[in-house]
Amino acid sequence: LDDRDYVEATTSGSTGIPKQIKLKKQSMVNSALATGDYLKLSPKNRALLCLPADFIAGKMMIIRSIILGLHLDIIRPSSMPLSLTSKNYDFCAMIPLQASKSLVDLPRVKKVILGGASIDGELEAKLQTISTEVYSSYGMTETISHIAMRKVNHTEVHQNTYKALPNVTFTQDERHCLVIDAPLIADHPVVTNDIV
């Protein structure tokens, strides 16, 4: 919390060599609002931060909590984060490994977004049997975390398709790679190396 209009972050390398970039604070606010609208999060909902805050996923959990008025509990990142708390939560972001090792406790969280890696078939099958609403997210540091989501469970038909968040559009470049246009989040289209 300083008077600069940006936050420095390091990219993961998904669009090239990892590098330091500046993310506009207003863009982070816009991303938080889009997630809140998409997941219907409300002020005073209880959220859990169980990811490192030096990466975009952890940073955005903090920003979402501030902007959306969520009550945020912060615990040490662990492969079994829910074993470190006995509370119930409305919202949490995890990586698939954390979810796979937390299946017994996951129903204590109403909504979970999974990112940072794809969800394998075995985990996807196990997630069908729990009460938690689980979403697979697609995004990167350059897009200030996720810009598309796919509902993993509680659907009538298996969903393979990610749905863009509001004000996000997708095109392809000449290599057939994904180009993300998210004007409320990024000043310029983000060209990925993901073939679509």
Question: Where are the regions that the model predicts?
Answer:
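Conserved AMP-binding A3 loop
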Residues: 5-33, 40
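Conserved S/T- and glycine-rich ATP-binding loop of Class I adenylate-forming
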Residues: 11-14, 47, 62, 92, ...
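AMP-binding/adenylate-forming
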Residues: 25-30, 46-101
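Short helix-loop-beta connector
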Residues: 41-45
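Residue-level signal for inorganic ion chemistry
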Residues: 62, 95, 112, 170, ...
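Gly/Ser/Thr-rich phosphate-binding loop
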Residues: 103-155
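Conserved ATP-binding loop and adjacent catalytic segment of the adenylate-forming AMP-binding
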Residues: 132-175, 185-189
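Conserved ATP-binding/catalytic segment of the ANL
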Residues: 179-196
